[in-house]
Design a protein with these regions (language model features):
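Conserved S/T- and glycine-rich ATP-binding loop of Class I adenylate-forming
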Residues: 57, 74, 105, 163-166, ...
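A short N-terminal helical cap/helix-turn-helix that marks the beginning
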Residues: 1-21, 215-217
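AMP-binding adenylation
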Residues: 186-188, 192-218
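Conserved AMP-binding A3 loop
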Residues: 29-33, 158-185, 202
Length: 218
């Protein structure tokens, strides 16, 4: 049986070497095959660390290739994922981490000064996606040590985003999880398929915009 329609795996079966993510600043690309492999491996890591359907991860870092890999890992694991603007003050980041109940936190060496001012003692899984951070595991090492292939019981996750806080503190929007298998067409975010002629379509992901970044996936 192939991957569910309009998921990274589905597109990887058709155009594995086509770019799924293109970094606007550098031109760096992540292919559909890489996105499928890396998000699947991370999903396995998170499951092995005890995360289960309904748990929340948080991401706060600059725009980099790992950001959407992490989001897709959560999406296919039945997890909520909270994208936190990397330009917020540490106190604001701390509030969102505490409020969303994150049990895994992804950041990067570029955020070292801000991360050093956070209390992360209650978050069991800390991962640096780019570079080294004290007390954080390295993203590349986790992926290298994980088995390939998707989990056998993938479930739909979803984003947990925050309002801008213009009338007070930002408010988390904790929507109910779909409770459906990953790729269920009624509830899943979709990848716009490539046309047979190879024409690219660009999609702006909501969680990236609201986190103070923009990412285009083809």
């Amino acid at each position: 049986m192939g991957a569910a329609p309009l998921t990274p795996g589905w597109q990887a079966e058709r155009t594995p070497d086509a770019p799924a993510i293109i970094m606007g600043a550098t031109g760096e690309t992540v292919t559909y095959a890489e996105l499928e492999d890396r998000s699947s491996r991370l999903a396995r890591v998170l499951r092995a660390r005890g995360l289960s359907e309904g748990d929340t991860i948080a991401i706060c870092m600059e725009n980099n290739r790992a950001y959407l890999e992490i989001a897709w890992a959560a999406q296919r694991s039945g997890l909520r994922y909270t994208a936190i603007n990397s330009h917020l003050r540490p106190a604001e980041v701390q509030y969102m981490l505490d409020d969303c109940g994150a049990v895994a936190f992804f950041s990067s060496a570029a955020m070292a000064d801000e991360v050093a001012r956070l209390d992360l003692s209650v978050i069991p899984v800390l991962v640096s996606a780019e570079g080294d951070l004290t007390a954080f595991e390295r993203y590349a090492d986790l992926l290298a040590g994980a088995a390939p292939g998707p989990l056998g019981d993938e479930r739909e996750g979803r984003e947990m985003l925050y309002s801008s806080g213009t009338t007070g503190r930002p408010k988390g929007v904790r929507k109910q999880l779909p409770g459906t298998p990953f790729g269920d067409p009624a509830s899943a975010p979709v990848i716009v398929p490539r046309e047979p002629n190879g024409k690219l379509y660009k999609r702006l992901l909501r969680e990236r915009y609201w986190a103070g970044h923009r990412s285009l996936v083809t």
